Amino acid sequence: MKYKLSEVMDLIGGGTPKTSKPEYWNGDIPWLSVKDFNDGFRYVYETEKTITQSGLENSSTKLLKRGDVIISARGTVGEIATIPFPMAFNQSCYGLRARNGIVTSDYLYYLIKHNVSVLKKNTHGSVFDTITRNTFDNIEVEIPSIETQEKIASILSDYDEKIELNNAINNNLLEQLNQLFIEFSTRCEWNYLSIGEIAEKVAMGPFGSNIKVSTFVESGVPIISGNHLRGYFLEEPSYNYITEAHADKLKNSIVYPKDIVFTHAGNIGQAAMIPDGCEYPYYVLSQRQFYLRCNTMMVAPEYVLLFFHSKQGQHELLSYANQTGVPSIAQPASNLKKICLPIPPISEQKKWLLVVEPIIAMYQNNYQETKRLSILRDTLLPKLMSGELDVSDIDF
């Protein structure tokens, strides 16, 4: 049966308590903004900010229930997640609550996920793309029976549950790596050396004029941007590409496995290593990145990576940040070379790596499996939602 998208759910608006009222903030109620759920995972469990009951009662924000869906509606449009427990949210998002008897909460999540591209095409606004209430009125969807909805949601949820499990395991593995670094780096009073002393090379990405949209091609050498550096290791969702001939002219900005890539403008503080077994043999940086190639006769790149994810490493890196305008690190290559860290003897590092490398390998295996599961899920999604794959004979 056909419905307007607005007819299958209740649309709930968010809000922000007054920031001038400290009694409204840092309470027990999670308060969502898009940065909390833009990672592609189905559920959102943590928020950067929290509010108090007084903040909830004295603002236009609302409390979403378990199973409700949240969607970003302004600026970064179309990020979605399911709410696992009550959370409030800001005015740049909508809460979507399934209407009983028409759709289930699980099916609504996948219905919205399937229609994100349609929602984006129906945005409004001259400055920022914005999803409005009218957007949902203008989209028509075919809704199957509740029984069919439950079957479809169950199939897709199996993939998301495994993806969530892999993510939880990997978060635990990162905690182990961080602890191993802290224990090793503080075990003795190791000699301090500067990055300049342990680096084989520190170099910048190209000037912006050397890589622009007009130079992109369908395949070739992938360009690394901040979107690929959100964790400890290079993430490979999708790329823009330049030709090999073009990349050859940018040799100073080419990076390889074991190089550590940093962001110096925008999301400063990012530091990710290109792992062994990555998708491509080499990459080119965008203009907002720079990189460190370690002298492996002196230091293990894994050790340096974990240093820059420690509190001390982040403090050292961000101490060179400009305090005005767009967040950026001043003279990134020069200042990176000045940063000092404790360097154990390479013989001790090799013993440490015997413990660390299997953990990294497990992390990468989980990451690759998650990529495969995500591709399978996203391939099945349109086929299931359109009815191309018939689930009527499937028993649960």
For each predicted feature, which ranges?
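A short beta-sheet element
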Residues: S33-V34, T47-K113, S225-G226, H246-G313, ...
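Sequence-specific dsDNA recognition surfaces
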Residues: Y3-P22, K35-R66, G196-V213, N227-T263, ...
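A short glycine-rich beta-alpha junction/loop motif
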Residues: A73, M87-Y94, V127-A153, Y282-F290, ...
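Short amphipathic alpha-helical signal-transduction/dimerization elements
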Residues: I112, V116, K120, D160, ...
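Non-catalytic DNA-recognition/assembly elements of restriction-modification systems
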Residues: M1-G15, N138-F207, I343-V391
